Amino acid sequence: MDASWHQSDQVLDRLREKALELGFTAIGVTDPDVSQHVSFLEHWLESGFHGSMEWFERHLDLRRDPTQLVPGTQRVISVRLDYLPENTDCIDILNDPDMAYISRYALGRDYHKLMRKRLKHLGDWFSDEIAPHGFRVFSDSAPLLEKHLAEKAGLGWIGKHTLLLSRSAGSWFFLGELLTDCPLPVSDEHEKSRCGSCTACLDICPTNAFPAPYQLDATKCISYLTIEHKGPIPEALRAPMGNRVFGCDDCQLVCPWNRYAAIGDPAFHPRHALDRQPLCELFGWTEAEFLMKTEGSPLRRAGYVKFLENLAIGLGNSHSDTERVIQTLRSKLGQHGPTLDEHILWAIAALQRRASENALDNASAHQSNHAHQQAPDAGQI
């Protein structure tokens, strides 16, 4: 075989063809150098924007240089796997305070195993059909700056909400990587930023988690608060959470580029009607029900008690029958630890306060109408 075979565009074409056959929707190749992004990462960590996600601080040397993670790495093959589910009526659910909003990526199957399996198939095929080179696959499972690597590989550009954007898929996709010692040609097609002057993603954030464009303060991000955060959620952020009980999609839902996203892999379509569940219904799940209905689901990452803690806040922001909701909340008091109890008591107080305010408003409106009806007609004075 010609020694320059690996530099042929035909190799990339065959690689892309196989990737599409395996269900990936885009693929690109880049070198592993991410040095230009290291200072930004260090500043983000120094600002404390990572919250309790201490793993960002660990193995910082590996994030700076992927060749230390996998010695001998010459190229990073970055892949895209679209997940947009169909017909989820997400805006209607988000606007209904009595329904549970679960982030779109978490409505179906957890992507990690599926991504790794397909990447492994791709790597094995490459070694068998093209050339026997070493590789390792990653799916959000290693200290890699995967968004920056994907951007370098031509899969899109990083938007002001810090997510990777593609003209063909918006931001509704997962990323995976295959690190190899094969000196493949790098992708020569790169996306320039197409955000322009748009700030829709920054303006919509319920908790003001973006201190500036391209910067995310995770400690205020609802996705972080409902999945990674341990302990009570800060009280000032509970009401803005609304009915978002696992993740948040607001910054993606308003992004103009997401209008062009195609429906994703069927593996990520909703299971157990998670796209249309009332808050009270989910809060009533036993742990056995939770484990059964979230098998193979991203919801498992939060765990049963954390999920209840999030649901309690959602119920505190709900508008349905106050007494019924309070009774539902009280059914879990004293059973699953102090954080859940704190959230439940906050929710009950919020519901009672809102009920009192509504009663006062109704009484005031009634008195106003009564006074208007009793007032003499001007012609009778």
Language-model regions, residue ranges each:
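Auxiliary alpha/beta "docking" domains used to position bulky ligands
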Residues: 1-194, 233, 242, 370-372, ...
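Structural detector for internal amphipathic alpha-helices that build alpha-solenoid repeat scaffolds
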Residues: 308-320, 341-351
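A beta-strand-loop signature enriched in Asp, Gly, Thr, and Trp
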Residues: 222-242, 253-289
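Flavin-dependent oxidoreductase catalytic cores
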Residues: 189-190, 197-200, 210-213, 300
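Alpha-helix N-cap/helix-start positions at coil->helix boundaries
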Residues: 301-306, 336-339
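Acidic, Ser/Thr- and Gly/Pro-rich intrinsically disordered linkers and low-complexity segments
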Residues: 290-302
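Iron-sulfur cluster-binding cysteine motifs and their immediate structural context
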Residues: 21-24, 200-224, 244-268
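Amphipathic alpha-helical scaffolding segments comprising HEAT/armadillo-like alpha-solenoid repeats
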Residues: 291-292, 320-333, 354-365
